[in-house]
Amino acid sequence: MLLLCLPASVAAQLLPAFPGAEGHGRYTTGGRGGNVYHVTTLEDSEAKGTLRHAVKQKGARIIVFDVAGTIYLKSDLKISNDYITIAGQTAPGQGICIADYPVIISANDVILRYLRFRVGTESIANGGEPDGLGGMDRKNIIVDHCSISWSVDECLSVYGSENTTVQWCIVSESLRSSGHSKGVHGYGGNWGGAHASYHHNLMAHHESRVPRLGPRPGTQEREYMDLRNNVFYNWAGNGCYGGEGMKVNIVNNYYKPGPATPNSAVRYRIAKIGVRTTAYCTNSDGTPNAWKPMEHVWGQFYVDGNVIEGNANVTADNWTKGIYEQINNKECDNTFNDQVKAEMKLSAPLETEFVTTHTAEQAFKQVLLYAGCSKERDIIDERIVKAVSYTHLRAHETELHL
């Protein structure tokens, strides 16, 4: 009865985006109540019936699919107009895959569900170094049951926004030697935001940023992030790091080292926390840049219940070796001290929008069963999940053109 007495605009905000939507982005409206556009062809053009045509329309809209298969983009697909739902679960058969160029979220109130993003190296010839799925500096976004792989830069970097959720996704096989201008690359993603939730995702086979806890200038003073019930497998160079000035829950995640994971401290890393250094916050001419407000500001973290497979000590005590011993004080302008050590550790979790929470071991099983574009998994996701499930299966980089 209380809900019926509220103004319509307020009541709408209290409706979940869809059954099963959780976390800080759960009340995203997307295209609710808007026009319905049918994708009837896999061609990429601005003609009616294409995905690009539907995305470019204005006003609230829901995009459904009458076809299945791979849409080979001819250029970046930018979602620029607010209030959109792209419902990949409506496609027949094995669903929809988007390839060759990235999809970029540049709008507010966006719902993406049951889609595959396998970008590959096609756009490098045109100067691109694409993410698989990217978006920042927006609000009200939820990405659900998507599969993202084969990026040149990060696979999934949806961050620096307000009220976001990324849930039940598979983020795998960023390309390590694909022609990126910086050389060896292959990163999982930048994750963070002002009230951002990342839960029940699988990140597998990445060189680094698994994930990178990454603030943006627009949200750096109010970064508030919940990272729980994710599975991280076979990180190589740097694993999870960052968190400069952020407030973060790191709860009940499952870390499984793989064949590419070094036999060093990174093997039992939960997160390598850092700060914005003076050099980072200063332009080449000596003037302060956009990061200056957070110079030498340490974040605060609630870390509990995380499992490092094969390391009972760090599983029992997440902080000593999983967090504290990972910090490089020299890289932090020697600002890490006993006071910082005490203040960065929260005794109670940050409040968060509701997320069904499992133990790390339960989450491992649930994620392998249900994450990704799992209405009908393709052979890529099946292979990734099997590699995580069976230690003896060796990881290998796939640099194929879809």
Name each region found by the language model.
Residues 172-176, 184-251:
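Long, polar low-complexity repeats
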Residues 228-389:
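Extracellular beta-rich repeat passengers
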Residues 391-398:
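Conserved small/polar residues in nucleotide/adenosyl-binding loops
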